[in-house]
C-alpha cells in the first residue's frame, strides 16, 4: 500500500469519507518505527517536513485539523542533546512530562510522547498560544546492524480549542487512557495505553438479517452454509509479534 500516494505538496489528500485518526500506539509502531527502520509504510500519508522551518499556522495542511509530519531533531548546541525548536516568530516549549506509549497487548514500551506549546516572541518572555505539538520518538535506538539512521520523530500539530476552566497544560489529547503515578519526582512518566478491557466499551454489531444480536466479536457462524442470511462480516486476526518486537527485522 506504500505505492498509494496520499500526500501532495506536503498536504494530506484523503478520498471523501476517509479520516486519518491513528492512536499513539499506531503512530509509533506502524509509522515512526517503520520510518526509522527504512521499512515500507502502511501508506504514504505522512509527509517529511522540518516543523521548525515554519510557524505552526504556516505549515502545510488544513489549519482546522490535526497535521502529521515526519521531522528530524536538530541539536541546539553542537555537543548537546537539546533540540533546537525555534521558528521565525517564536519557539516550541516542552510542557509537562514525557509519557510512555505502550502496546495494548503485552504493555511493552514502544515510544515516548512529548507535549510542546508554541510561544510567540523570544524566550523567556514569549507569549503562549493555543498551538500544541505531540512529538513521538522511539523508546530505544535501532540496532547498530541497521547502520546510521536519521534522528526521525513524528509530530502531530493542532490548534487547541479552549473550553472553560481547563488546565493550561492540558495537551488536548483524549484518545488514550492515562494512568497517573502519584510519585512527584522530576522524572515521573505517565503511561499511555490503548487497551480497553471493560466489556461496556466493546462495540455491538447488529446483523439485521438475523434475529439474534452478537456482542462477542469471536462469535462467528460455524459454517457459511448454516445461515444463508449472514451479513458476510469477517474477522481478521493480527499477530501482536510485529508490534511488540523491538527489532526492525520484523518489518522485513
Curated annotation (Swiss-Prot):
Binding region for DNA: 110-166
Subcellular location as annotated: Nucleus
Pfam families, A to Z: NAM
Coiled-coil portions: none
Annotated stretches, region: PEST-like: 213-226
GO molecular function, one term: DNA binding
This protein's UniProt keywords: Activator, DNA-binding, Host-virus interaction, Nucleus, Repressor, Stress response, Transcription, Transcription regulation
Reported consequences of knocking out the gene: Accelerated leaf aging.
Superkingdom: Eukaryota
Domain NAC: 14-160
The keyword Transport belongs to this UniProt entry's keyword annotation: no
Biased composition (Low complexity): 180-194, 219-252
Signal peptide coordinates: none
Annotated PROSITE patterns: NAC
Subunit structure: Interacts with NAC007/VND4, NAC026/VND5 and NAC030/VND7. Interacts with the mungbean yellow mosaic virus (MYMV) AC1 replication-associated protein.
Note: Over-expression of NAC083 inhibits protoxylem vessel formation in roots.
Domain note: The NAC domain includes a DNA binding domain and a dimerization domain.
Protein name as annotated: NAC domain-containing protein 83
Phylogenetic placement of the source organism: Eukaryota, Viridiplantae, Streptophyta, Embryophyta, Tracheophyta
